[in-house]
Amino acid sequence: QMREALLMQADAGMVGPLLVNPDGSEQRGCRRDIPTPWQIFCVALLFHKFMPDHPRFRNFNHTARPLPDENSIVQAISGACMLVTRNAMDKVGALDRKFFLHFEDLDWCRRFDAAGFKIVFAPHAVVEHTRGVCSRQRPIRVEYHKHKSLITFLRKHFTAYYPSSFMAAVYFVVAMRFFAVVLTKIFGLRKGRPAAWERLMTESTGSEP
């Protein structure tokens, strides 16, 4: 079905399936927008919680939106499962090694779009994905690389379009969130319960350790 989705869309370079959790629910991140510094800022400050339907403040994950009946063009899919064409990969290049962990898929999606290739979400191609299995042993290190990659992503793609003062504010918010996540992970692990900030980070980015 993913291969058919690529063949049906002449200018498609990448396709992703509907990722589901083991319980059958849709997994965040398999259809989403490319997060901008403004969106990161709004999600970090919970603006999307108070105004979820406002176009300037809503979350960039599409999980809360109804599933499309047919293949649809999206800004980004999840790196957990991607099918790309050889032609597109030859023109765009491989994944950027500057991203050690997380956000390499969003970077790739943005580069595919910049090269003129469409990104397709195929809702009828269903893949079960269990998140976080490979990195549960070192959760704080994972969070460090996740937040570091977020800053790398923002610097690479948006510094030319946003005032330096606003970008500095976004980096500060990301750094504060990292420290909050670390603290809640420490206390969450000690008390044996998930941390609220960890859930927020997952919700906002669509990424999981």
For each of these PLM feature ranges, what is it?
Residues 192-209:
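Membrane-interface aromatic/basic loop that binds lipid-linked glycans or pyrophosphate carriers
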Residues 34-75:
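Short, flexible, basic/aromatic active-site loop/helix in glycosyltransferases
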Residues 29, 40, 44, 91-92, ...:
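Residues that scaffold the ATP/ADP-binding catalytic core of kinase and kinase-like folds
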Residues 1, 66-126:
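A short, conserved alpha-helix in the catalytic core of glycosyltransferases
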Residues 110-191:
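Active-site-adjacent helix/loop segment of glycosyltransferases
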Residues 30-36, 137-140:
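Short, hinge-like loop/turn segments at secondary-structure boundaries
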Residues 1-31:
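Conserved donor NDP-sugar-binding/catalytic core segment of glycosyltransferases
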